[in-house]
A protein has these predicted regions:
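Conserved NAD(P)H cofactor-binding loop of Rossmann-fold oxidoreductase domains
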Residues: 85-90
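Substrate-binding pocket helix/loop in short-chain dehydrogenase/reductase
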Residues: 93-103
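Conserved glycine-rich cofactor-binding loop
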Residues: 11-12
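Conserved glycine-rich Rossmann-like NAD(P)H-binding loop of the short-chain dehydrogenase/reductase
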Residues: 23-43
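Active-site helix of classical SDR
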Residues: 117, 151
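Residue(s) in the substrate-gating loop at a strand-loop-helix junction
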Residues: 135
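C-terminal helical subdomain
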Residues: 175, 196-233
Length: 255
């Protein structure tokens, strides 16, 4: 039985950093790297000597998820690490975002993530790990990032509950909640009119991933990198959400 890791969103950003910086104590025979982009593997080969098995799959489509399910049933690997880093957002007034994009966010950010967790768990043993990528937006409702923030709140709640359920089996679940991070995420998220205008700080994905792996080894349930991000996390616990939303809208000069 071969040991594998599965990483979605592996072609760029946080997902790619998770792949390239995987701790040496996680010994796997193969990394299943999943990304929507075609031919993304060529770039990864130049940056890594890991045994990467690439899959060009759009996780918004159920057929893509079924391909993974069928492959797991066929090969029956031992999954030592699952990282759900695929996802996208749209920054705009909710009624100005296409229905296709709004539903697509839920399909990729939530449905695909949930499906992959439930598919993978039967092939995981004690000391295996699941890392799900949420966002600091998961801690509060965020106008003009409405569906995205709600989808990440789901990821946080689902992951923490799942971690509790799996703890007796020795399977650990970590939720990573990044603040603004320098990735290609914004190429798709930001519309031409740029509703979101102010980014307090922009973190490097390598730092986010480094802390996440450290927190995984420490068996933490949530990983938040950066002083400002952690301040926001605390304030969202202490302050009424109506007040937090008002501050956000004022900061972005939104009505």
């Amino acid at each position: 039985m071969k040991n594998i890791a599965i990483i979605t969103g592996a072609s760029s950003g946080i997902g790619k950093e998770f792949l390239l910086n995987m701790p040496k104590n996680i010994e796997v025979d193969e990394i299943w790297a999943i990304a929507r982009e075609k031919n993304f593997f060529e770039g990864l080969k130049e940056e890594s000597n890991l045994n990467i098995r690439p899959f060009s799959l759009d996780l918004e489509k159920e057929t893509s998820l079924m391909k993974i399910k069928d492959l797991l049933e066929e090969e029956k690997p031992n999954i030592k690490l699952l990282i759900n880093a695929a996802g996208f957002g749209k920054f705009e007034k909710s009624t100005n975002i296409s229905l296709e994009d709004s539903v697509g966010m839920i399909k990729v950010n939530d449905m695909a993530l949930t499906s992959l967790c439930l598919m993978a768990i039967p092939y995981m043993k004690k000391n295996s790990n699941i890392i799900n990528i949420a966002s600091v937006a998961a801690f509060q409702p965020v106008p003009y990032i409405n569906v995205y923030a709600a989808s990440k709140a789901y990821v946080l709640s689902f992951s923490r509950s799942l971690g509790k359920e799996l703890s007796k089996e020795g399977i650990h679940v970590l939720t990573v909640c990044p603040f603004w991070t320098k990735t290609k995420f914004f190429d798709r998220a930001v519309e031409k009119n740029k509703v979101i205008k102010k980014y307090v700080v922009m973190y490097d994905p390598t730092d986010v991933v480094e802390k996440a792996y450290i927190d995984m080894q420490k068996k933490k349930s949530v990983s938040v990198y950066g002083f400002i991000a952690n301040v926001q996390r605390v304030l969202c616990k202490l302050l009424p959400h109506n007040f937090v939303m008002s501050i956000w809208c004022k900061q972005q000069k939104l009505k």
